[in-house]
Amino acid sequence: MIADRYADLAFEHCTHQVLADITSRHGVDFATTLFYDRIRRSPQNRELVAALESAGAETERPQARGRILIAPALFYRERPDIGGDGAAIQRAALAAGLDVEILPVASAGTARTNAEQLRTLLYERCTDPTVLVSLSKGAADVRLAFESMPPPPGLRAWVIVSGLLHGTPAIDRLTRRWWSRWGLRLLLARHGAPFELASEFSAYKSSSLRKPALAPPGILVVNLFGCPLAAHVGTRFGRIRHRQLSALGPNDGLTLLRDAFVQPGLIYPLWGADHYFRTDAVPGLLSRLITFLVAKDCLRAAARVR
C-alpha cells in the first residue's frame, strides 16, 4: 500500500524538492496519493479531517449566526459558470442562516490592486463573528492585504479554497514563448485585465507572491484544496497544465499543491477534485465545515434542524 511506502516521511518533510524527487521515481499520481495521505495523517489536521468526514453530521443541517465574506476568484463576474463567485459557499451559508456577501473587488484586478480594496472593505464589512472565505486568486488578494494590516476586529477565521497564494510555473510556461504569451495577453485583455496580472503570478520572476504565505495572527486558518490524480482533472486545459506541471510534483491543474496552503493552518485535501473544487462531495463538506467553525467559536451556534 502507498501508505506504507516512505513510512518515515511526515507531512512537514514533504518539501517541494522531496515531492519532485518522489514524482520522478514513481510518477505524479503516486506522489499525489502519498502527499494526500501525509496531510491527513498529520496530527495538526486530524481534528479537521474527522469533522469534515463525520458520518453523523450527514443527517443534520447546521444552523449558525454570523457573517461569511467571500473574496472571489479571478473573472468571477465574467465567468460565474466556473464557480469563482462562491455560489456553492453562498448556498451552504444561506441554508445555515448566515449572512453572506461577495466582497466587490475588481473582477479582473491585479492582486496588488484588489489587496488595496480589501484593506478598506474588510474593516467596513467585518462584524463579530465573521469568517472570510477566499477562492483561488482571491487568496492572493487577501494574503497581500493581510501583509500590511492586522486582521480586523470580528474576523474569526480565514478559509482558503484552492488557494492561488504563490506564483505558479504554469504562468511562466505561458509567458516563455511569444505565441503563448500573445494568447495570454489576448485572454486577459478580453476581460479587461492588465498583463501585470500574469507577472504577479510568475514562480520565478520577482513578485510580491514569491515569499512564503503566512497566517495572520489571532485567527483560525483552514485550507481546502483538491487533490487530483491525472484522470480526475476535469477540463482539457486543466489536463494539459497538470501534465506540464507534473514533473514538479502534485498539482491541481493550475498550481502545485505544496503552494496551495498557508501555515500555520489546518489543511483538508479533497480527493478527486481539481483546482475548480467541484465534486459531488462539496455541498456536504461545506455544511460540515460550518459546523466545525461553530465548534471553534468562529461562528455562533443556533438551534439545529433535522
Residue ranges and their predicted role:
Residues T59-T130, L186:
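Active-site catalytic motif of lipid deacylating hydrolases and related acyltransferases
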Residues D81-I82, P169-L174, A231-F237:
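Short aromatic-enriched loop/helix-cap "lid" or pocket-rim segments at secondary-structure transitions
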